[in-house]
Amino acid sequence: MSDQFDAKAFLKTVTSQPGVYRMYDAGGTVIYVGKAKDLKKRLSSYFRSNLASRKTEALVAQIQQIDVTVTHTETEALLLEHNYIKLYQPRYNVLLRDDKSYPFIFLSGDTHPRLAMHRGAKHAKGEYFGPFPNGYAVRETLALLQKIFPIRQCENSVYRNRSRPCLQYQIGRCLGPCVAGLVSEEEYAQQVEYVRLFLSGKDDQVLTQLIARMEKASQNLEFEEAARIRDQIQAVRRVTEKQFVSNTGDDLDVIGVAFDAGMACVHVLFIRQGKVLGSRSYFPKVPGGTELGEVVETFVGQFYLQGSQMRTLPGEILLDFNLSDKTLLADSLTELAGRRINVQTKPRGDRARYLKLARTNAATALTSKLSQQSTVHQRLSALATVLKLPEVKRMECFDISHTMGEQTVASCVVFDANGPLRSEYRRYNITGITPGDDYAAMNQVLRRRYGKAIEESKIPDVILIDGGKGQLAQAKAVFAELDVPWDKNRPLLLGVAKGADRKAGLETLFFEPEGEGFSLPSDSPALHVIQHIRDESHDHAIGGHRKKRAKVKNTSTLETIEGVGPKRRQMLLKYMGGLQGLRNASVEEIAKVPGISQGLAEKIFWSLKH
């Protein structure tokens, strides 16, 4: 504990009410957030002579200040604790690293409803189905729904400005409600109802209604209509046969946990209306010395109680671990949801099978993750040996991408001891250089990246320069001129020249621009990690360049038209669903866009045609 922190004096001021406490280090950084039913009793436990663990000892040794927030109830304290954890990301708390809100399928409340993927706050009028484990699961479901129930998925701006049906109508993936006369209001409403039932898990009702309609069409000698409905029935049956369905139609989240070698995996299985929508594995950041019970309690609290997560709470949560605060968690979730939420730890029947499945998935995912990390550690250790460094904890790699010198983008990719650190990948738009001058581009990106203060932990041990001797010379020149408060001599600059025909395994490495290069055997683990980060950097640069090029392509044609400024360009692209939609639009359709007169619409039409 810091000499400046007087624990005895502080504890005299602490109340015995419930609340939340925040611990700070000498730098004023929050290092731990906790909650307590009795603040005085809980905080006193930190300053006993016999502390529970080394983790607690390390924490207490750094305390410089403690702030306390008193709450009315334990539930308030629990909610506030997890909001503070999200805000401060304290070093000694278990942290849920995935902060994305879950995607839903959104069925809008329009006259002709549309289907779309949705994340975030649910402000738009309509119905939300989910949550789904990831965006891929939503897109896959939307593609399936489009084949079975062809209701529109286009944006309202596109829908409102169409005078003729799009390609989706031509291939039978949309009923074309945008054009009068293509589909009756009754038929469209019926298909929307099928979608609603299907997404609610009521497949049997969908099939019953479809079979009745098919039989009626057949009796009326409407054989084409009967055949179309028959195909719908078969499609629905094919989908439902593939799903693992429980005997009950409950909404459940099932949470399995695995813990090994200081790493935890929490696997969440999402079940809605008795069907498994999907699952996701999480690897929370676990401080050393943390016990499994704390990992599970903190994860579950953060997973459901951090307000911005926008999670939809199921009626029941199944856990394979007993929580000391299970009742408090259930009460907090109940208060949050406005309905009773049960937390179960010893289920039977189907629920026990689900829990076993989640536990198995957690163990499998953790084994895979540890194996990947072991491989990365071996490769970095081999690289450190080759480069004669004590260790390689952090690497950064740079690459340049452009087309004939235009839209130049530089990428910076970061690897740490566990591999790619994608949250720290960066792209830089390069400007003010001679088109096609890769040396100037490399010079600029390195100055922008390193010509400023850098945290000690973020100084790379190795900087890879993709491009060989010339690019390495630029890097050496930049670092020689840097005037920065950190140790600019710490990073080892390494040039990587592509092999003949750009074949993997034939790379040449350079320590000095004028020196002789050297190669590593094709089966060298050190070479493999160099190839990995180099390929990541290359892909990241190309991805940024393509986005930039596409943006220029979408706006450059419109920029040449007199009277079409940035706001009108944006409005045109928004209402027409992009440049291609605008190219296909008639003068009358263009004139319907706000701010576009008939005369300007004609000018835009003819400019795009010629």
UniProtKB/Swiss-Prot annotation:
PROSITE patterns xref list: GIY_YIG (PS50164), UVR (PS50151), UVRC (PS50165)
Subcellular location: Cytoplasm
SMART domains documented for this protein: GIYc, HhH1
GO cellular component, one term: cytoplasm
GO MF annotation, one: DNA binding
Domain UVR span(s) in chain numbering: 204-239
UniProt keyword terms in alphabetical order: Cytoplasm, DNA damage, DNA excision, DNA repair, Excision nuclease, SOS response
InterPro entries according to UniProt: GIY-YIG_endonuc (IPR000305), GIY-YIG_endonuc_sf (IPR035901), GIY-YIG_UvrC_Cho (IPR047296), Hlx-hairpin-Hlx_DNA-bd_motif (IPR003583), RuvA_2-like (IPR010994), UVR_dom (IPR001943), UVR_dom_sf (IPR036876), UvrABC_protein_C (IPR050066)
Entry's Gene Ontology BP terms: nucleotide-excision repair; SOS response
Domain GIY-YIG: 16-94
CDD domains found in the cross-reference section: GIY-YIG_UvrC_Cho
Domain of life from the UniProt record: Bacteria
Record Pfam families: GIY-YIG, HHH_5, UVR, UvrC_RNaseH, UvrC_RNaseH_dom
Family label: Belongs to the UvrC family.
Binding partners and assembly: Interacts with UvrB in an incision complex.
Function as written in the Swiss-Prot or TrEMBL entry: The UvrABC repair system catalyzes the recognition and processing of DNA lesions. UvrC both incises the 5' and 3' sides of the lesion. The N-terminal half is responsible for the 3' incision and the C-terminal half is responsible for the 5' incision.
The name this protein goes by in its record: UvrABC system protein C
Organism: Escherichia fergusonii (strain ATCC 35469 / DSM 13698 / CCUG 18766 / IAM 14443 / JCM 21226 / LMG 7866 / NBRC 102419 / NCTC 12128 / CDC 0568-73)
